C-alpha cells in the first residue's frame, strides 16, 4: 500500500516539479543563460547539484550514480567558476517563481497553496536523510518565503528523496552504474542516445553483456 501511495504521489508532483523547475523551462534557460552557464548539460548539472557546494565531477557522478564522469566533467566544476553554487540555487528559485506565475497566475496566492506547503513540510518529517546526500543537501536549503515557490521546493525534495531510493535499490541489486543506464533504457523503450549519459561504447557494450549474463 505504501508503494502504491508513493507512486500515486509521484504521478502528481513529477509534472509540477519539471514544468516549473526543470532545466528545459524557458525561465530556467533564460536565467542560466544570463548567468553564463552555457548549454543544457551545464545548466542541468549546475542547478541540480548546486546545493552540494563546489563539488567536482566525480562527486556528482557518484551521487547521480548512472551519470558517467565523462558526461559530467565538461560542466562540473567549470560551472562554479562562472557562478557560485549559492547564486545558482537562488537563480533556480527565481526561475521557479517566474514559471509558476506564468503557469498558475490565479492560484499562486490561494489558500490551497498555503495548505499544500504545510502538508509537504509535514511529509518531510518522514523522509530520512541517511544515505541520500543529494536530498540532504536540498533539504538543508532555507525554504523560500513565497508559498508557491516553497511548495515547489517541497515537491522537489520528495522527488529527490524518491530518486535516491531508486539508487539504493539499484545498488542493493548489485547493478553497477554502467548497467543501471541500459537497464533503464530496456524498461522504458527509449533510444540509447537519449539516455546513454556518455558511457564509452566499450563500457556500454560490456554492461549490456553483463546484464544478459544476469538473466
Describe these PLM feature segments.
Residues 1-214:
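Phosphate/adenylate-binding glycine loop and adjacent helical scaffold
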